[in-house]
Amino acid sequence: MNNRVHQGHFARKRFGQNFLNDHFVIDSIVSAIHPQPGQAVVEIGPGLGALTAPVGERMDRFTVIELDRDLAARLETHPTLKDKLTIIQQDAMTIDFAALAEQAGQPLRVFGNLPYNISTPLMFHLFSYTQSIRDMHFMLQKEVVNRLVAGPNSKAFGRLSVMAQYYCQVIPVLEVPPEAFKPAPKVDSAVVRLVPHTEIPYPVSDIRVLSRITTEAFNQRRKTLRNSLGNLFTPDVLAELGIDATSRAENVSVEQYCRLANWLSEHPAKQE
């Protein structure tokens, strides 16, 4: 028996498809999302509808984004869902979520069992729309959730941690074993809730500068800041900003990275 076939659909590796089929896990996720009629709910990657169907029981209307044309076609003819769904057959990485929120007249509630092969770039795409998003609930590879929630001075703390926590409060919800899926992935999974900050705790004047600094620091995470960011900051500037030049990327807090970004924005000549 081919374990990549579920409900008559062959799971496509190129789309990173693993279908959730554990009812306890499904109920736990839907309870965590707690969708309500009238809310602007958007599901990314509904697949065979494991989450779509129970969410649909609570909603009059909601939107799903599905790249796989075969799965989108199945949803279009689904007996209980077809009249409730607005189906966008498109890559979520190309979606303008601000436009969706504007059409809905309210911030979006986004959820999904995200394909693990695109989860990190999709997160960065969504972070750019947090002003249009009320909250997000995602099933992700457990290692990615660990990175999202990690604090400074831990190996899991990285660029994703800094950028996620800059935009959102990050809350782990539950862990999910491989056997909850078909086909079973080779890794553990977890559900995370991301709630965009009403006010950014440590605002930066140019997010691109924060992105550049974190990229350069974490691309050379074993080096001290004196070396990894030496082209941008002298040891004296780091000291002036309250940051030890002998520390490494993982030892610097979100607030300190924002401090670095704002200093660099005020001294544009240093960016050249």
Swiss-Prot record:
Its EC number is 2.1.1.182. PROSITE patterns: RRNA_A_DIMETH (PS01131), SAM_RNA_A_N6_MT (PS51689). Its main location: cytoplasm. One of its GO terms (cellular component) is cytosol. The keyword Methyltransferase applies. It is found in: Cytoplasm. InterPro entries: KsgA/Erm, rRNA_Ade_diMease-like_C, rRNA_Ade_Mease_Trfase_CS, rRNA_Ade_methylase_Trfase_N, rRNA_adenine_dimethylase, SAM-dependent_MTases_sf. GO terms for molecular function: 16S rRNA (adenine(1518)-N(6)/adenine(1519)-N(6))-dimethyltransferase activity; RNA binding. It is an enzyme of class 2 (transferase). S-adenosyl-L-methionine binds at N18, L20, G45, E66, D91, N113. Keywords: Cytoplasm, Methyltransferase, RNA-binding, rRNA processing, S-adenosyl-L-methionine, Transferase. It comes from the Bacteria. It catalyses: adenosine(1518)/adenosine(1519) in 16S rRNA + 4 S-adenosyl-L-methionine = N(6)-dimethyladenosine(1518)/N(6)-dimethyladenosine(1519) in 16S rRNA + 4 S-adenosyl-L-homocysteine + 4 H(+). Specifically dimethylates two adjacent adenosines (A1518 and A1519) in the loop of a conserved hairpin near the 3'-end of 16S rRNA in the 30S particle. May play a critical role in biogenesis of 30S subunits. Belongs to the class I-like SAM-binding methyltransferase superfamily. rRNA adenine N(6)-methyltransferase family. RsmA subfamily. PANTHER family: DIMETHYLADENOSINE TRANSFERASE, DIMETHYLADENOSINE TRANSFERASE-RELATED. This is Ribosomal RNA small subunit methyltransferase A. It comes from Pectobacterium carotovorum subsp. carotovorum (strain PC1). The lineage of its organism: Bacteria, Pseudomonadati, Pseudomonadota, Gammaproteobacteria, Enterobacterales.
